[in-house]
Curated annotation (Swiss-Prot):
It catalyses: uridine(55) in tRNA = pseudouridine(55) in tRNA. Belongs to the pseudouridine synthase TruB family. Type 1 subfamily. This is tRNA pseudouridine synthase B. HAMAP family: TruB_bact. GO terms for biological process: mRNA pseudouridine synthesis; tRNA pseudouridine synthesis. GO terms for molecular function: RNA binding; tRNA pseudouridine(55) synthase activity. Gene3D superfamilies: Pseudouridine synthase (3.30.2350.10). It comes from Ehrlichia canis (strain Jake). InterPro entries: PsdUridine_synth_cat_dom_sf (IPR020103), PsdUridine_synth_N (IPR002501), tRNA_psdUridine_synth_TruB (IPR014780), TruB_C (IPR032819). PANTHER family: PSEUDOURIDYLATE SYNTHASE TRUB1 (PTHR13767:SF2), TRNA-PSEUDOURIDINE SYNTHASE (PTHR13767). The keyword tRNA processing applies. The keyword S-adenosyl-L-methionine does not apply. Keywords: Isomerase, tRNA processing. Responsible for synthesis of pseudouridine from uracil-55 in the psi GC loop of transfer RNAs.
Length: 301
């Protein structure tokens, strides 16, 4: 079995546990997720099954979108509801001031990850140091925020809902923290839902319970997306090469194209035969070089 599960991860579960549960449900040995989702967050968690794990890099460096709620008035150690209160503010922001500073959080900007994060510090994850009581001083790094919108503001409960679209590496908790600091009212995330990871969308995601039910029907197309689902933005060559050439690619050998082939150069392409995955290849000066070879015998469905 190989392909992708577009999982709707529940709140309160780690991404690693979600992967293990999917492996258990589908009875597979090899699986991995494309981008960690915090335990307190819910939503889209793409999980690669079997040979699809070889194309996971193409599902990581993609646009991601979130819906999140910020509670104003407090700063917490984890920048979310799990942490301890470290500071308070009586100030209540207004819609006008929130909208006024939003442009400062769009584009290429420097961001300091939360102390409780998976960022490595001298080979140790930051959250492990923070949990042991050590001071964690993380360096800022450049991140790319494409869009940030204020969706609603609950004055009575002093909280606001936002929509965020960004590239990899952005911490929503850091966005909430920095919004609160800039407004002078402090803030932390109380609710976080990921609604998009590249081509994976929340509206098409399935829960673990749904996966169990669909798996029992023995209809793979109802819960498993094809391996090439994350390769839609790269060139696809299906039934392009001869049987002998396909055999060479599968054995890791290069192919030299003759004058009959139109393609001369291609940074990266996906090669298949009869829509069965063969390899990820590069083509330079009419030489096809297999970069990733898929060990599959037939279609997933």
């Amino acid at each position: 079995m190989y392909g992708w599960v577009n999982l709707d991860k529940p709140c309160g579960m780690s991404s690693a546990l979600a992967v293990n549960l999917v492996k258990r449900i589908l009875n597979v040995k090899k699986a991995g997720h494309a981008g960690t989702l915090d335990p307190l967050a819910s939503g889209v968690l793409p999980i690669a099954i079997g040979e699809a794990t070889k194309v996971m890099p193409y599902a990581v460096d993609v646009i991601k979108s979130y819906l999140f709620t910020v509670q104003w008035g407090e700063q917490r150690t984890t920048d979310d509801a799990e942490g301890e209160i470290v500071d308070k503010s009586d100030m209540i922001p207004c819609v006008e001031n929130i909208k006024k500073i939003i442009p400062d959080f769009i584009g290429l900007l420097k961001q300091v990850p939360p102390s409780f994060s998976a960022v490595h510090v001298n080979g140790v994850r930051a959250f492990e140091l923070a949990r042991s009581g050590q001071d964690v001083n993380l360096s800022s790094r450049f991140v790319d925020v494409l869009e940030l919108k204020l969706l609603s503001f609950d004055v009575e409960n002093n909280k606001a809902d936002f929509y965020l679209s960004c590239r990899k590496g952005v911490y929503v908790r850091s966005i909430a923290r920095d919004l609160g600091i800039k407004l002078g009212c402090l803030g932390y995330v109380t609710k976080l839902q990921r609604v998009r990871v590249g081509c994976f969308r929340k509206k098409n995601a399935i829960t673990l319970e749904m996966l169990k039910t669909l798996y029992s029907t023995n209809c793979k197309s109802s819960y498993l997306l094809p391996l090439w689902y994350v390769l839609q933005d790269i060139k696809h060559l299906n039934n392009f090469f001869s049987e002998l050439e396909i055999k060479k690619l599968k054995n890791g050998q290069n192919i030299e194209l003759n004058n009959l082939y139109v393609i001369r150069n291609c940074d990266i392409c996906y090669v298949s035969t009869g829509n069965v995955p063969v390899a990820i290849c590069s083509i330079v000066n009419s030489v096809v070089r297999p970069v990733r070879i898929f060990n599959v015998r037939g279609l997933v469905f």
